[in-house]
A protein has these predicted regions:
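Short amphipathic alpha-helical segments, especially helix-boundary/capping motifs
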Residues: 15-16, 38
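Conserved small/polar residues in nucleotide/adenosyl-binding loops
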Residues: 135-141
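Rieske [2Fe-2S] iron-sulfur-binding domain
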Residues: 22-134
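A boundary/linker detector
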Residues: 1-14
Length: 145
């Protein structure tokens, strides 16, 4: 059992492993805002691949929550989920399932490496979306279910 002290997060304990974060049927066109592992997260299904992706919830540019918005043009124009990425509702930066920013509208040239969010390993099985509670350790190589 890991403690949050092991990760510099305080005194709470949490188990290491895979956890069901959503049933697969709930993951449709809109991203889901979740809180797991002491983090605000956003879960979405890529339109291109159909695969789920789980990212830290806040854009590194201005701190906007990637999943909580119903009024921005990105959401109204149905470009919130763009290909296999998700666009920030504020300035439309697009983050891929690996957490890297791969498009900044109006910017030509290289995208800074710091323009990224943490990506969490996910697996879809048994009608559920599973996420692993640690991102810095080696993942199991065998199927979980």
């Amino acid at each position: 059992m890991a403690t949050t002290r092991d990760y510099g997060l305080g005194e709470f304990t949490f188990p290491r492993g895979w956890f069901m974060v959503s049933d697969a049927a709930s993951l449709r066109e809109k991203p889901l805002s979740l809180r797991f592992f002491g983090q605000d997260l956003v879960l979405y299904r890529g339109k291109k691949s159909g695969k789920p992706a789980l990212l830290d919830a806040y854009c590194p540019h201005m701190g906007t929550h990637l999943g909580l918005n119903d009024t921005s043009y990105v959401v109204r124009d149905d470009t919130h989920i763009d290909g296999d990425g998700i666009r920030c509702p504020y300035h439309a930066w697009r983050f891929g399932p690996d957490g890297k920013c791969d498009d900044i509208p109006g910017i030509k040239g290289p995208i800074p490496k710091a323009a990224c969010v943490r990506s969490w390993p996910v697996h879809e099985s048994l009608g559920a979306i599973w996420a692993v509670s640690y991102t810095h350790l080696t993942l199991p190589t065998k199927r979980i279910v």
